[in-house]
Amino acid sequence: MQNVLTQRLTNDEQQKTLKTLIEKNLEIKTMNKFDIENLDLYYGENQALKAINLPIPVRQVTALIGPSGCGKSTLLRCLNRMNDLIEGVKITGKLAMDGEDIYGNVDVADLRIKVGMVFQKPNPFPMSIYENVAYGLRAQGIKDKKHIDEVVERSLRGAALWDEVKDRLKSHAFGLSGGQQQRLCIARTIAMEPDVILMDEPTSALDPIATHKIEELMEELKKNYTIVIVTHSMQQARRISDRTAFFLMGELVEHNDTQVIFSEPSDDRTRGYVNGDFG
């Protein structure tokens, strides 16, 4: 009798644990990393973003698409306050990360560690492969060589680059191919353990083979990071993203699951853009 009761309790505990895990998994899937509400941005008198309302889900790839000058890169730079570096910029509205307004009383340097960025053109530092990845750690005052070695290897593995460079870590980063340099920049970013990785057209300067490797890498990275990517390639947005937001002349026309945006958009402007009628 006691064994039966014990077994029942064990089963009940297992069911309870399973329920908790399912609830947490659902919470991760439905949580937003960013909540953008009524966001306006001005460059002097010119309004570049107009009343943007956009949730960005956690641990998914969100693609920002639209013709040149539509505001997608401007919005991307809002997510880690890179626009602060531009004179005359004015921002109103709310942009919250994990519920905290990032334009409130926050440490901007800390924000930019949590929200890393990979730019259009690979920009490795003029130093060795190893030192590129270790640079941010050293800048934070970390001196433990064993710890730095571990982070460098882990980050290069995370960027799918370790096997290609492990025997030449002391070689200059400029000796890498363009695709390898871009993956090195991704490794440098994830070495700082961010929550979010922003990518501003990260494959536009790369050949198709290097582009494919970056896209494969993004599929792995989203298991641990929230990714927001600006892309001019409709095919790329369709391949890699979970959510897509379409911008036109500073306005967010619509956002939805990527499959919906490309197959059943609700706005004729979106339909025209994804069908190649303009752009």
From Swiss-Prot:
Family annotation (SMART domains): AAA
Key words, A-Z: ATP-binding, Cell inner membrane, Cell membrane, Membrane, Nucleotide-binding, Phosphate transport, Translocase, Transport
Residues the record lists as binding ATP: 66-73
Subcellular locations according to the entry: Cell inner membrane
One MF annotation (Gene Ontology) recorded for this entry: ATP binding
Entry's Gene Ontology cellular component terms: plasma membrane
Family annotation (SUPFAM superfamilies): P-loop containing nucleoside triphosphate hydrolases
Pfam families: ABC_tran (PF00005)
Membrane-topology annotation of the record: Peripheral membrane protein
Example of a GO biological process term: phosphate ion transmembrane transport
PROSITE patterns: ABC_TRANSPORTER_1, ABC_TRANSPORTER_2, PSTB
Reactions the enzyme catalyzes: phosphate(out) + ATP + H2O = ADP + 2 phosphate(in) + H(+)
CDD domains: ABC_PstB_phosphate_transporter
Root EC class: translocase
Domain ABC transporter: 34-274
Chief localisation class: membrane
Similarity section: Belongs to the ABC transporter superfamily. Phosphate importer (TC 3.A.1.7) family.
Protein role: Part of the ABC transporter complex PstSACB involved in phosphate import. Responsible for energy coupling to the transport system.
Subunit structure: The complex is composed of two ATP-binding proteins (PstB), two transmembrane proteins (PstC and PstA) and a solute-binding protein (PstS).
Protein name: Phosphate import ATP-binding protein PstB 2
